[in-house]
Structures are given as structure tokens and as C-alpha cells.
Amino acid sequence: MTEQAEDALPISFTDAAALKVKTLLDEEENDALKLRVYVTGGGCSGFQYGFTFDEKVNEGDFTVEKQGVQLVVDPMSLQYLVGGEVDYTSGLEGSRFFVKNPNATTTCGCGASFSV
């Protein structure tokens, strides 16, 4: 799937998330890496979010670009993430990527798992 106008995207990511991805890519010295977001079964609420760096974009993957970096989501995960936003936070509890997901009916305390 190709990039679309930002207001029509099924998932987006914040400037903070894009900046952190860019920083990590610069450290790795590999501009081919993309942030892949996925959903798997598990966690205390039924589903959990996962983040990894990947050089490949598979057939059917959705990609969106911001500040020169790409976010990639597989079709199965995308159905649970429509309308969501990937963000990055750094604070007293540590630093992490997280998903603001309007489809989640419940989330765990740490925000890493959810149910729909």
C-alpha cells in the first residue's frame, strides 16, 4: 500500500516517534531500516503491540513516511490499528514507543496490551 494524505491515513506516527526512529537509524548507520509495528496475541488484555526494525516491506504492508523515516504495518495488524497513532515518550518510567489506539476497549496499566 502506498502513502496517502496524512488526514486519510489508517495509522500515523507523531513527530516525536519519527525523530526517535531517525536517531536510532543514524546510530545504526542503516537508512534502509523501517519501524515495523505489529499486533500479536498475548499480554494481560488479549493482544499486545510489538515494535521492531525491518529492512523489508512485504506485499500488502502499509507504509507511511514522516521526516524521512518509514512506519510499516502488516495487513493483519493494521485491522486492529486503524485510526491509531504511534508515539514515543521518555520520562521517569523509561523511554518507549507506544500506540494510541481508538479501537482498544481496555488496555493494561503499562499500555503494551489491549482488547477490542
UniProtKB/Swiss-Prot annotation:
One of its GO terms (biological process) is iron-sulfur cluster assembly. GO terms for cellular component: cytosol. Keywords: Iron, Iron-sulfur, Metal-binding. Iron-sulfur cluster binds at C44, C108, C110. It holds the Pfam family Fe-S_biosyn. InterPro entries: FeS_biogenesis, FeS_cluster_insertion, FeS_cluster_insertion_CS, FeS_cluster_insertion_RrpA, HesB-like_dom_sf. GO terms for molecular function: 2 iron, 2 sulfur cluster binding; 4 iron, 4 sulfur cluster binding; iron ion binding. Binds 1 iron-sulfur cluster per subunit. Transmembrane segments: none annotated. Its cofactor is iron-sulfur cluster. Homodimer. NCBIfam families: iron-sulfur cluster assembly accessory protein, PRK13623.1. Required for insertion of 4Fe-4S clusters for at least IspG. Belongs to the HesB/IscA family. This is Iron-sulfur cluster insertion protein ErpA. It comes from Shewanella piezotolerans (strain WP3 / JCM 13877). The lineage of its organism: Bacteria, Pseudomonadati, Pseudomonadota, Gammaproteobacteria, Alteromonadales. The gene is erpA.
